Amino acid sequence: MATIRIHDEANTTIENQEEVASFLDSQEVIYEQWDITRLPEHLSEKYDLTEEEKQQILDTFETEIKDISTRRGYKAQDVISLSDSNPKLDELLENFKREHHHTDDEVRFIVSGHGIFVIQGQDGTFFDVRLNPGDLISVPENIRHYFTLQEDRKVVAVRIFVTTEGWVPIYEKDSVNQ
């Protein structure tokens, strides 16, 4: 279940799931919880995945992926896995931390591990969405944000796209608001 930390003077934290969902809805961020217990046990917390295992993850959540894709007009999906076993992890994380936006939604469903989306709210204040297995988030188009990992430095996520080509980040700044 996701938690929120607002980058305000009090570092306000929201942990109650109804309040998390309400806050994200007020920011026009889609947040859903999918039944992660459906994931086959041999894929839980596995970060070095074969193409067949990635397809098995997509097949497991096919109904949910089709549902949100129908509602939002998404056309493609894939599975990404990041962990310390990737020799380019630090380089990838540096690139991910560059604040950017897209001309379409950025959608992630966390399968294993953890991730953080840092999103600019409607009032200009940034907030963190700390995601756990079972959490789906859709950052709306043209909203400034970036993604990073939590302390465990590993995540498996389903990415869902509007086009079969995926999305292209548009960078506004080289510095990151943290």
Swiss-Prot record:
<feature type="binding site">
    <location>
        <position position="145"/>
    </location>
    <ligand>
        <name>Fe(2+)</name>
    </ligand>
</feature>
<dbReference type="InterPro" id="IPR023956">
    <property type="entry name" value="ARD_bac"/>
</dbReference>
<keyword id="KW-0408">Iron</keyword>
<dbReference type="GO" id="GO:0019509">
    <property type="term" value="P:L-methionine salvage from methylthioadenosine"/>
</dbReference>
<dbReference type="InterPro" id="IPR004313">
    <property type="entry name" value="ARD"/>
</dbReference>
<comment type="subunit">
    <text>Monomer.</text>
</comment>
<feature type="binding site">
    <location>
        <position position="100"/>
    </location>
    <ligand>
        <name>Ni(2+)</name>
    </ligand>
</feature>
<keyword id="KW-0479">Metal-binding</keyword>
<dbReference type="Pfam" id="PF03079">
    <property type="entry name" value="ARD"/>
</dbReference>
<feature type="site" description="May play a role in metal incorporation in vivo">
    <location>
        <position position="99"/>
    </location>
</feature>
<feature type="binding site">
    <location>
        <position position="145"/>
    </location>
    <ligand>
        <name>Ni(2+)</name>
    </ligand>
</feature>
<keyword id="KW-0533">Nickel</keyword>
<feature type="binding site">
    <location>
        <position position="106"/>
    </location>
    <ligand>
        <name>Fe(2+)</name>
    </ligand>
</feature>
<keyword id="KW-0560">Oxidoreductase</keyword>
<dbReference type="GO" id="GO:0019284">
    <property type="term" value="P:L-methionine salvage from S-adenosylmethionine"/>
</dbReference>
<feature type="site" description="May play a role in transmitting local conformational changes">
    <location>
        <position position="105"/>
    </location>
</feature>
<dbReference type="GO" id="GO:0010308">
    <property type="term" value="F:acireductone dioxygenase (Ni2+-requiring) activity"/>
</dbReference>
<dbReference type="InterPro" id="IPR014710">
    <property type="entry name" value="RmlC-like_jellyroll"/>
</dbReference>
<comment type="pathway">
    <text>Amino-acid biosynthesis; L-methionine biosynthesis via salvage pathway; L-methionine from S-methyl-5-thio-alpha-D-ribose 1-phosphate: step 5/6.</text>
</comment>
<dbReference type="InterPro" id="IPR011051">
    <property type="entry name" value="RmlC_Cupin_sf"/>
</dbReference>
<dbReference type="GO" id="GO:0006555">
    <property type="term" value="P:methionine metabolic process"/>
</dbReference>
<feature type="binding site">
    <location>
        <position position="100"/>
    </location>
    <ligand>
        <name>Fe(2+)</name>
    </ligand>
</feature>
<feature type="binding site">
    <location>
        <position position="102"/>
    </location>
    <ligand>
        <name>Ni(2+)</name>
    </ligand>
</feature>
<dbReference type="GO" id="GO:0005506">
    <property type="term" value="F:iron ion binding"/>
</dbReference>
<comment type="similarity">
    <text>Belongs to the acireductone dioxygenase (ARD) family.</text>
</comment>
<protein>
    <recommendedName>
        <fullName>Acireductone dioxygenase</fullName>
        <ecNumber>1.13.11.54</ecNumber>
        <ecNumber>1.13.11.53</ecNumber>
    </recommendedName>
</protein>
<feature type="binding site">
    <location>
        <position position="102"/>
    </location>
    <ligand>
        <name>Fe(2+)</name>
    </ligand>
</feature>
<dbReference type="GO" id="GO:0016151">
    <property type="term" value="F:nickel cation binding"/>
</dbReference>
<feature type="site" description="Important to generate the dianion">
    <location>
        <position position="108"/>
    </location>
</feature>
<keyword id="KW-0028">Amino-acid biosynthesis</keyword>
<feature type="binding site">
    <location>
        <position position="106"/>
    </location>
    <ligand>
        <name>Ni(2+)</name>
    </ligand>
</feature>
<keyword id="KW-0223">Dioxygenase</keyword>
<keyword id="KW-0486">Methionine biosynthesis</keyword>
<dbReference type="GO" id="GO:0010309">
    <property type="term" value="F:acireductone dioxygenase [iron(II)-requiring] activity"/>
</dbReference>
<comment type="function">
    <text>Catalyzes 2 different reactions between oxygen and the acireductone 1,2-dihydroxy-3-keto-5-methylthiopentene (DHK-MTPene) depending upon the metal bound in the active site. Fe-containing acireductone dioxygenase (Fe-ARD) produces formate and 2-keto-4-methylthiobutyrate (KMTB), the alpha-ketoacid precursor of methionine in the methionine recycle pathway. Ni-containing acireductone dioxygenase (Ni-ARD) produces methylthiopropionate, carbon monoxide and formate, and does not lie on the methionine recycle pathway.</text>
</comment>
